[in-house]
Regions:
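Active-site metal-binding motif and surrounding structural segment of the metallo-beta-lactamase
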Residues: 60-106, 227-232
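Conserved beta-strand hairpin/beta-sheet module of binuclear metal-dependent hydrolase folds
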Residues: 21-71, 188-202
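Divalent metal-coordination and catalytic microenvironments
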Residues: 44, 54, 69, 83, ...
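Accessory terminal helices/loops
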Residues: 136, 140-142, 227-233, 241-316
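Boundary at the C-terminal end of the N-terminal hydrophobic targeting segment
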Residues: 12-21
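Metallo-beta-lactamase
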Residues: 50, 57-59, 119-256
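Bacterial N-terminal signal peptides
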Residues: 4-12
């Protein structure tokens, strides 16, 4: 899994932050040294309570989410998972333990992950634990991930998202959109026309796109769909909220990276081009970017065709 790569890098932490608009509240995820990330979370006010988009991975992140809900005096009436990666869905069980009536709106791609990706990742993680190289804190995190993988009922949707369309979630009108074969086999992204708010999940990741389960060209198409909405604020899966002009800049950087990967330019040139094009979204003290972009060039963008297209078809 991605943490096996990232925990080997010189990691720079980012402090969690919270902000929002009139009808929504943003809780920023974190990526602290020596552990995996938490994705961003967003609360939306709804007639029946609160809608929570993505639940993070770590107990500390979930404590912030629960504290906000309790401070508001409202139940979490619905969870929307943008995708099945555990830094976005790993807290489902904890949130639903506190709010057992919360429905889970999510895609069905987790079925393929449960059948193949999770078992394969678990095997690698078990070998890492057996090596004795994991710190006690990291070992505890890996075991929490195992527990999340085993709790199938918390990862699966009670309200599956199988196509794009307008729905009412906890009484609030939202557009739940399904992007096939992009950052994952099925990415759910949310557009709130009343707030002009777009919640992108890992279709947009500020510092560098995570291609671990990505289909590059499908992802490029999904970004065009995002651009078609008249949003004013976009919440990425990781990183700070963006205006539409900022998103367009990020989308250009994404396209340039794919285009560079398709040429015979040196890998270092493609890495440098990403760092230049996406400079506004990369923290100045983050030393992970060179290794991460190089890794994704080797493992996905310039991999042999079968590997490059591995996640451009169903995992099941």
């Amino acid at each position: 899994m991605r943490w096996l790569l990232l925990l080997c890098l010189a990691m720079a932490g980012s402090a969690p932050a919270a902000a929002g608009g009139k009808g929504w509240h943003f809780v920023r995820g974190s990526f602290e040294p020596g552990r995996g990330p938490d994705g961003n979370s967003v609360f939306l006010d709804a007639p029946e309570g609160l809608i929570l988009v993505d639940t993070g991975r770590h107990p500390g992140h979930q404590e912030k989410l629960l504290a906000y809900a309790h401070a508001r005096g409202k139940p979490v009436a619905a969870i929307v998972n943008t995708h099945w990666h555990l830094d976005h869905s790993g807290g489902n069980a904890e949130i639903r333990a506190a709010f057992p009536n919360a429905e889970v709106h999510a895609g069905t791609a987790v079925d393929g992950a449960l059948a193949g990706f999770f078992p394969n990742s678990r095997k690698a993680a078990e070998e890492f634990l057996a090596s004795g190289k994991a710190s006690p804190e990291l070992a505890a995190e890996i075991k929490r991930d195992f527990a999340a993988m085993d709790d199938v009922g918390s990862l699966k949707a009670t309200r599956p998202v199988t196509r794009s369309g307008e729905v009412r979630v906890a009484g609030r009108r939202l557009q739940l959109n399904l992007a096939p074969f992009a950052a994952t086999e099925g990415d759910v992204w949310i557009y709130d026309p009343d707030e002009k708010l777009l919640i992108a999940g890992d279709l947009v990741v500020g510092p560098v796109p995570f291609f671990d389960t990505g289909c590059p060209e499908g992802w490029r198409k999904a970004l065009a769909e995002l651009e078609s909405r008249p949003f004013e604020t976009l919440i990425p899966g990781h990183g700070a909220p963006m205006t539409k002009p900022q998103f367009l800049r990020w989308r250009t950087a994404f396209g340039n990276l794919l285009d560079c990967a398709a040429t015979d330019r040196e890998k270092a040139e493609c890495v440098a081009a990403w760092k230049r094009d996406a400079a506004a979204f990369i923290p100045a003290d983050d030393r992970r970017i060179d290794e991460m972009v190089a890794y994704y060039l080797d493992s996905r963008l310039r991999a042999p065709p079968a590997e490059r297209g591995k996640y451009c078809r169903p995992l099941r």
